[in-house]
Amino acid sequence: MTQKIKCALIGPGNIGTDLLYKLKRSPFLEPVWMIGIDPESEGLKRATDMGLKTCATGVDGFLPHVLEDNVQIAFDATSAYVHAENSRKLNALGVLMIDLTPAAIGPFCVPPVNLKEHVGRREMNVNMVTCGGQATIPMVAAVSRVQPVAYGEIVATVSSKSAGPGTRKNIDEFTRTTAGAVEKVGGAKKGKAIIIINPAEPPLVMRDTVHCLTETAPDQAAITESIHAMIKEVQKYVPGYRLVNGPVFDGNRVSVYMEVTGLGDFLPTYAGNLDIMTAAGARTAEMFAEEMIKGTLKLEPVHA
C-alpha cells in the first residue's frame, strides 16, 4: 500500500461530488473531508456515506482540523467570488489549492498542454480554467505549436442538467477566464470564449467547437497530425474525448468539432463537462502528490 496524500473537497455540488468519485480511485490521493455550507446538502450526505468527515460551516469550520488530519491538498469547487478567501486561509496552513472555479488567482493548468511546466515550481494555488477550457485549449495549443494563431474562439455547449447553481453564477467569469487561458495556455494572440447551456431533454452530450485563425496559410498535414496527437494525450485521462469532425480548413481558419462523454461517475455520461474538469483536477493533484510522496516537494505555509 503506497502512502497517499490526504485531500479535502470544498463544495459538495456536481463538480465536487464527481471529483470525489475520481479521488476514491486514485493511487496517490485520499479524500478525507468534504466541506459545504448547507447541512441538508445531498453532496454532504453522500460524502458522509462514503466515509468522509464533513463540515457544513464552510472553510472556517474546517480550519481547526487541517493540521491534525494532515490535509495537504484542497480542491475548491465552490464559486469564483469566495475562492480567494478560501485559498488564503488554507495556503496559510501549508495546503496546496487546486482551484476548479474560474477565479484564476493562480497559474492556469491544462494537463496535456502545460502540466509538466508546473513541476518544481512550488506553486500553492493552481487554476484548472473551466470545463470549456479543459475541452478546447488542447486543440488551440495543437494548432499554435505548429504555427502562430492570431485568434482562437471556443464555443462550449453543455446540458442544462450538468450546470449547477455555482456554474450559472460564474458565467461571466467562465467566459473571461477561458478566453484568457486560450491566449496564455493555448497560445492564441487573442482569445474568445462562448458558453451555451442547452435545456434540451434528453440532455445532450458536451459539444465543443474550436476555431483558430492562423497568421499564415495553415500547414494542413502538420496541423492534422498535431491535433490527432493531442487528442490521444487528453484521452489518457478523459477516454470519452472524441473528434466529431475536422480539422476543417477554410482559408486561414482551422475548425475542430469535439464531443466529450463522461464516465458517468456522478451525473450520467452526457455530463462530459464535469468529467473533463474533475479528471484534469485529479490528474494535476496526482502529479503534485507523487512529488510529495517522493520527497521532492515540501509544501510551505504562505502568509498573505
UniProtKB/Swiss-Prot annotation:
Assigned protein family: Belongs to the acetaldehyde dehydrogenase family.
Protein's name according to its UniProt entry: Acetaldehyde dehydrogenase 2
NCBIfam families (UniProt xref): ac_ald_DH_ac, PRK08300.1
Catalytic activity: acetaldehyde + NAD(+) + CoA = acetyl-CoA + NADH + H(+)
Location of the active site: 131
One Pfam family, short name: AcetDehyd-dimer
Gene Ontology molecular function: any one: acetaldehyde dehydrogenase (acetylating) activity
Domain of life: Bacteria
UniProt xrefs under HAMAP family: Ac_ald_DH_ac
UniProt keyword annotation of DNA repair present: no
Keyword NAD set for record: yes
Upper classification of the organism: Bacteria, Pseudomonadati, Pseudomonadota, Betaproteobacteria, Rhodocyclales
